[in-house]
């Protein structure tokens, strides 16, 4: 039985992800982690979705049923769970969130005791336990062996101190006017506190979660409101987080969204110039623009490409000994400070780069030109093996023969096909994209 996608278990709350399935997943995960338990503690956090309460209670029931003691810390960013799991010496950390997805979706992400996301082997083992009804039944405890759960509200201070320590001590945000969009999500309290304590004048939008407005026309996936607010208050910069605050989108003082690849390039240069890039390497994904690779090559920084997903970026970083990587979507990993993408660390590193440059954000972050690139997320009715679709390989060969780069893949969390085309001729690119969309609508029921 396949439960895990590209980023944990995810689905419509109350449909694919029910109270019953969450309880079973708690049982299965508890059985898995107890085999290597050190402290018999598991940390659980969540974002601000209404369904988070249902899933949290069910998950905790499963974990305590197999003997685990559970620490519940309420709404906190995903990277906070990763950090606090290790800091509080827990066997594992669990985040209940569907990240940037709509409020009626939810998900469950697992972290090991070192704060890293589980590898695929661990996920497969949990899936096998989940499907073994006899093992689930036999592993449940009774009497004094049943685990306990407790809520702790004061751990937020640990995370705030940790994030503030990632900002260079010689720099200050005094005099910086910024707008912060917390997407009505997990960082709605912690993010404004961090920037204010570092001296910035902070204007906060979308910081009033009500259970169903998370990511709604706001945050990292829809930064229009942020752009308008930056212009309205004449801010120096704007930052948008997503629902669980592991992703960052930057808006300059003109209200323009900074391209994710340009941000990766700027931050790689920031680390190199401050002598904190461990190796002349940066990791991005197959989605990143070729212009980023060429820009970094001129600076003698080699760009490595991983599969799509911050988990795969981190795996390649660890394998190659790199301490910086990211996705153009805004997942940026500074492994000196975080075990996963952290929007708040990324925002502070961006501010450090801009401050040291002495330039306005629009000039500091716009340091190379991109090749025309177009991405379409096409809703589809079915997923077929791409190579088995009649005419697929012929179409891809034709595109590549005209000098365009293509990347076609299914979303790991939604019924969508992601179509990416890139090349130097923008007009021809549009025509090829139209042809691709028509082809996949006809073959996949878009």
From Swiss-Prot:
UniProt keyword Translocase, yes or no? no
Residues of the active site are 99
- One CC-aspect GO term: cytosol
Where in this protein does the record say Phosphoserine is found?
99
Pfam entry (one): PGM_PMM_IV
Q: Which GO terms describe its molecular function?
A: magnesium ion binding; phosphoglucosamine mutase activity; phosphomannomutase activity
Report the co-factor binding details. Answer: Binds 1 Mg(2+) ion per subunit.
Record's comment on post-translational modification:
Activated by phosphorylation.
Where, in this chain's numbering, is Mg(2+) bound? Answer: 99, 242, 244, 246
Q: Which HAMAP family match?
A: GlmM_B
Q: What is this protein called?
A: Phosphoglucosamine mutase
This protein's species is Wolinella succinogenes (strain ATCC 29543 / DSM 1740 / CCUG 13145 / JCM 31913 / LMG 7466 / NCTC 11488 / FDC 602W) (Vibrio succinogenes)
Q: What is the gene called?
A: glmM
